[in-house]
């Protein structure tokens, strides 16, 4: 339907930027919240969920730096909104949302610094898709990995990372960010315990029958890594 067309195009645009950066041997940087005149639920930042949605989807698909739309907002009739400061030079509603998301990205970046991304993809309407060479395909994505998504209640984007024998998976809620709905995901974990990074903090969680069940918040993301591997 139209919504999934927009969402898949959103992912493919990011994937194409990533491919160009890789071909040029450059780190990938992306621009978030530049304009909200088209599908504002994705591109706005009036709520934390909207800002986190943009940032973590870009981060999951390879960005290691993000530019935010931060100069004075043009007239509202121009259909541009959610700058970090208003036309009067005052902090806008987006300011605190972006500040919180930036702190989480910084903490996550330090956590992932020695990891290498080995595959990325999405689950859209229950269908697993691989993101490769700038396109979204209906091919299986995980293979024989110690961590992988088994099921997702709603749409998610993910990337699998490796550090030697250690693996981890970054999962971002790709559901409508203004809905406020949680998104239940089930992750295969080849360990009795997993380290779960969320909201700038890491906690250890027991895994029942080799699985971890977690409810992602609106716009939220988690990084999961088996303990003791």
Predicted segments with their positions:
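Structural recognition of the beta-strand scaffold that forms the well-ordered cores
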Residues: 27-32, 59, 65-69, 170-171
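Carbohydrate-binding surface patches
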Residues: 123-192, 219
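Well-ordered, non-membrane alpha-helical segments in soluble/globular domains
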Residues: 3-17, 45-52, 94-101, 183-187
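Solvent-exposed beta-hairpin/edge-strand motifs
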Residues: 188-202
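C-terminal beta-strand-rich structural cap/linker in extracellular carbohydrate-active enzymes
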Residues: 207-229
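Active-site clefts of carbohydrate-active enzymes
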Residues: 14-49, 77-85
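Aromatic/acidic polysaccharide-binding cleft in carbohydrate-active enzymes
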Residues: 49-103, 118-128
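The substrate-binding groove and active-site-proximal loops of carbohydrate-active enzymes
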Residues: 1-9, 34-48, 87-90, 175
């Amino acid at each position: 339907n139209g919504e999934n067309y927009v969402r898949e195009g959103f992912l493919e645009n990011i994937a194409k930027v990533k491919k160009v950066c890789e071909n040029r041997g450059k780190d990938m940087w992306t621009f978030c919240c530049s304009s909200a005149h088209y599908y504002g639920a994705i591109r706005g930042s009036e709520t934390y969920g909207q800002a986190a949605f943009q940032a973590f989807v870009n981060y999951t698909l390879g960005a290691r730096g993000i530019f935010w739309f931060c100069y004075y907002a043009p007239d509202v009739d121009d259909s541009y909104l959610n700058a970090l400061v208003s036309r009067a030079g005052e902090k806008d509603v987006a300011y605190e949302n972006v500040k919180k998301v930036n702190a989480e990205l910084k903490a996550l970046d330090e956590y992932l610094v020695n990891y290498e991304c080995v595959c990325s993809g999405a689950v859209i309407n229950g269908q697993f898709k691989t993101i490769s060479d700038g396109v979204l395909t209906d091919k299986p994505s995980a293979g024989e990995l110690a961590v992988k998504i088994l099921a997702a209640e709603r749409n998610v984007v993910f990337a699998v990372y490796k550090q030697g024998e250690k693996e981890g998976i970054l999962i971002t809620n790709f559901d409508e960010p203004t809905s406020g709905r949680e998104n239940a995901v089930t992750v295969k974990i080849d360990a009795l315990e997993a380290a779960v990074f969320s909201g700038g903090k890491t906690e250890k969680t027991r895994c029942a029958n080799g699985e971890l069940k977690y409810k992602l918040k609106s716009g939220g993301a988690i990084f999961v890594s088996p303990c003791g591997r």
